[in-house]
Amino acid sequence: MKHSNKPYDSFQDELEDYIKVQKARGLEPKTCFRRMRGEYLESCGYREEFDSRPRYRMFDQRIPSGTNHSYPRSCSSSQTEDRVPQWLPAHDKIRLNSLNYCQFTRDGFSEKPVSLNLSQQEYNCGSYSVESVVHKDLCSGHSTIDPQVSHRQMYQKRKRHLEEGRERQEERPKHERKRSSEEMDLNKHKSIQRKKTKAETETVQDGTEKLKNRKEKKNRDVSSKKEDRKRRKEKKEQGEERTEEEMLWDQSILGF
């Protein structure tokens, strides 16, 4: 019994026709190849990776060799995984596996035989589409940076740092000169203040010494006057206190 090559309006019609052919041959094909992606993620609890390739092998083993056709395949899951970067997160790998499986099922049930060159072209296009999807997913969350722009920014930043360092080195002597002039002015002011305070203290000391000398001189004059007065008084008292012999002598000789 030959397989019909009539075109199908949908995948469901093609699948029903395939089931009828297999039942006519006495085989019981599996109709549930894969659940929907959302149901799979919900049931499996967001598993990181899964391997659906044994199902493909079981399905290929159930089909007789007479009905096998050279169907175009975009790329296998192992090839797609080899082309995927290792730094992709787990959910991106799951997404790529699901895209690969859908592409495989569509190509597997198409009834049109394709030449080798066309299958190779579709393989290249499929791999390019997968890579473009990965690139879009990555670019949606991360902004791409042009390496030339980054090198230019680094060069400008380094140049700016060098210019700032030169400006600091040029400004340092200015600050040092300004600081030295300020220190000189401060030292000069301090020396003037010291001289002024020294002169004031000297004048105060001179004044106190003069006052002290004047006071001492005055005290000496007063004491000398007192001593002279005391001597005069003593002489006078001595003159008044004559003895009887002196008085008789005076009377006899002088006639007093």
Swiss-Prot record:
Residues 208-247 form a coiled coil. Residues 61-83, 141-256 are annotated as: Disordered. This is Lysine-rich coiled-coil protein 1. Transmembrane segments: none annotated. Residues 161-188, 218-227 have a biased composition (Basic and acidic residues). The keyword Lipid biosynthesis does not apply. Keywords: Coiled coil. Residues 64-79, 141-153 have a biased composition (Polar residues). It comes from the Eukaryota.
